[in-house]
């Protein structure tokens, strides 16, 4: 789902699946210590997308509309 926004950190990845999400408005992380360290530091859960794009035909709609819902629902994940 390309757009004209600045690419996120996935732009540096080699995986075609990750690269197709490099211009999403979501601040995605590739699998790795950086994501888990941030989650631990902020006391937040980690949402894992397994990268099986053929099962995610609904993902673009969620990504497109997620800005406000994600911001509004962050409080549900705080302890």
UniProtKB/Swiss-Prot annotation:
Coiled coil: none annotated. It comes from the Bacteria. It holds the Pfam family Thioredox_DsbH. PANTHER family: SPERMATOGENESIS-ASSOCIATED PROTEIN 20 (PTHR42899:SF1). This is Uncharacterized protein YyaO.
């Amino acid at each position: 789902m390309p757009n004209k926004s600045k690419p996120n950190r996935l732009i540096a990845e080699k995986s075609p699946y990750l690269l197709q999400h490099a211009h999403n408005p979501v601040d995605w992380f590739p699998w790795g210590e950086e994501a888990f360290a941030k989650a631990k530091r902020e006391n937040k859960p980690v949402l894992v997308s397994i990268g099986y794009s053929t099962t995610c035909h609904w993902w673009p709609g969620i990504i497109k509309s997620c800005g406000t819902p994600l911001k509004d629902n962050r409080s549900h994940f705080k302890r």
